[in-house]
């Protein structure tokens, strides 16, 4: 018999194809913006922990890059390897799928999670867009056939629909453990990392479909001076033309990027922010394994 009052703690991997709502789901569960989001695929590049402690239960969510096909650069290999590694050594796996469409990349992820031996939950996202819920039944039945050991829960990550039910199922699957992190800690990532991600998010929201994947952000200075947090961020691109696009006509685009990033940073860090942005050309960085490691992309 399970002790419902036991202290529980464990790791929960959130996996799925790009742009399916994984980071939105994490942010809604945590009740604050931690993972960056955009409408463009492959927004998330690194695994990041989002930690939620509620009473005796501590769930440590692993937000992962979207598993994707195509893209032969070292950066693409890194993201796929990072996402696949998250399936190992976790206590629960959440496979997020979009009810509105099924792609080859969804199928690729499904074929990988079929080998998960621990608890597997399929979070059927964007069900708020379906007026007649009976339309969900064929898809639910098909998913259950493909993943007979999975528990399928319809949700809306954007609207927060049915997330309480999802979290209840997750908590029931977590092992009895002492908590691994202090109850007020929400992530394993540094403030410098979060600041860089916020700048990159604003770039992705400002620019076209291809350019954001050839951009990364490095924080060169992160210093509290009195009541103001001073942050200097370096935006790396691969070509001179990309630098001009980011700066924009008379510097208008980079000014908008900085203004939007600063507002989110002030909310996240609860401090006045002085943000300075620079753009630098570093040719071929996204396919240079040594450069990627120096930029914090780990083992490739």
Curated annotation (Swiss-Prot):
Region (G1): 16-23
GO CC annotations on file: cytosol; plasma membrane
GO terms, biological process: ribosomal small subunit assembly
UniProt-annotated stretches for the region G3: 63-66
InterPro entries: G_ERA_dom, GTP-bd, GTPase_Era-like, KH_dom-like_a/b, KH_dom_type_2, KH_sf_prok-type, P-loop_NTPase, Small_GTP-bd
Era-type G domain residues: 8-176
Stretch list, region G4: 125-128
Region G2, residue ranges: 42-46
Similarity section: Belongs to the TRAFAC class TrmE-Era-EngA-EngB-Septin-like GTPase superfamily. Era GTPase family.
The protein, known as: GTPase Era
Species this chain originates from: Pseudomonas fluorescens (strain Pf0-1)
């Amino acid at each position: 018999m399970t002790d419902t009052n036991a202290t529980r703690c464990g790791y929960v991997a959130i996996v799925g194809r790009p742009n399916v709502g994984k980071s939105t789901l994490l942010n809604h569960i945590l009740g604050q913006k931690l993972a960056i989001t955009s409408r463009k695929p492959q927004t998330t590049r690194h695994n990041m922990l989002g930690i939620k402690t509620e009473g005796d239960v501590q769930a440590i969510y692993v937000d992962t890059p979207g598993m994707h096909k195509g893209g032969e650069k070292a950066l693409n290999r890194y993201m796929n390897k990072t996402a696949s590694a998250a399936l190992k050594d976790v206590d629960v796996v959440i496979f997020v799928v979009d009810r509105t469409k099924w792609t080859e990349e969804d199928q690729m992820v499904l074929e990988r999670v079929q080998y998960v031996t621990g608890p597997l939950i399929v979070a059927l996202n964007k069900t708020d867009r379906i007026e007649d819920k009976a339309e969900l039944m064929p898809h639910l039945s098909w998913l259950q056939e493909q993943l007979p050991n999975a528990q399928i829960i319809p949700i809306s990550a954007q609207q927060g629909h049915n997330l309480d039910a999802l979290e209840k199922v997750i908590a029931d699957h977590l092992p009895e453990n002492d908590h691994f992190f202090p109850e007020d800690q929400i992530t394993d990532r540094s403030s410098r990392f979060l600041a860089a991600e916020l700048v990159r998010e604003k770039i992705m929201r400002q620019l076209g479909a291809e350019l954001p994947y050839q951009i990364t952000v490095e924080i060169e200075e992160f210093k509290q001076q009195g009541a103001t947090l001073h942050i200097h961020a370096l935006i790396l691109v691969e070509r001179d033309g990309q630098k001009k696009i980011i700066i924009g006509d008379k510097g208008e685009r980079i000014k908008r990027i900085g203004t939007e990033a600063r507002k989110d940073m002030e909310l996240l860090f609860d401090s006045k922010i002085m943000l300075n942005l620079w753009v630098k050309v570093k040719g071929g960085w996204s396919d240079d394994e040594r450069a990627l490691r120096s930029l914090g992309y780990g083992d490739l």
